[in-house]
Amino acid sequence: MKRRTFIQTGAAAFAASLIVKPSSSRAADTNKQYVFGFSQVTTVEPWRVEFNKQMLKEAAKHPNLKLIISDGQDQTAKQVSDVESFIQQAVDVLLISPKESAGLTGVVLKAIDAKIPVIVLDRNVNTDKYTSFIGGDNVVIGRAAGDYTVKLLGGSGAAKGNVVELWGGMGTAPAQDRHKGFDEVVSKESGIKSLLKPIDCDWKQQKGYDAMTTALKSFDKIDLVYGHNDPIAYGAYLAAKDAGREKEIKFLGIDGLPDLGVTWVARGELTATFVYPTPGAEGIRQGLKIMAGEKVEHNITLPTQTIDKSNAEQILKEAGIS
Ligand code: FRU
């Protein structure tokens, strides 16, 4: 048999896998034990760590629920085999946050054919046959970043400046949508110039750093960097700092985790970030609704929020960080 790598560490994970007395939740037949399999794309990025943490915390409230999380190690092939294995185990609900859309669509369809309810989280697949999709609206977030950019560069109709956009993974819906929303707004401003051809930073800080290092060498005047997530924006900031040019450039990111994006905004390294909530806890709640025979929404959109100098400190305080 093939070896599988599952993560179930820490107290919360342990509690999540305990099967004790019937839960007081609405989770259908409380004498029945449910097994949810969650295929997570990676566990190295901080946003993913928070995602799993929230999910395990929610699952731990339900003693009759066992949550198994697999780590796709940021590779499509690994994630496909993780999902195959959940199908073989006949989990009650499959949750998946895919590396990319195209490569994971086939195996998601396979799970649906096997009559397993599928909840897709954050990054989408190329089918809408799943039971539910839960995530932020990345077009809306992109537009918010676009509006913020226009404001920073002089306001509607008068905005002027050179912009570098650093993409997340180009084969993912969040990157496409974050571009789309942003472009919808800034392309209306004739004074705003986009300097680079789309460049794939695969959501990674190091790639943001490298792409920005090249951009700094090619362009004498860069006014604003729009990173598709906070790590990319921060990588770009570090590159500008190493080139002694960070003070002339504004940096915008997305995610808004207190200990990363919000902290960078509070320190004045990023100008703003836009919250992209982790969908794990909601995924558990919807999965239990499915088990209870309740109807769930086909699309559940999580809200965003703009974080800049005006509210960063307050958010850190509320998170117990500053
Ligand atoms: C983490 C991450 C987040 C980003 C999301 C998009 O893996 O890169 O930073 O917002 O995925 O799917």
Give the positions of each predicted feature.
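A residue-level marker of the well-folded mature domains of exported/periplasmic proteins
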Residues: I7-A11, L18, A28-S322
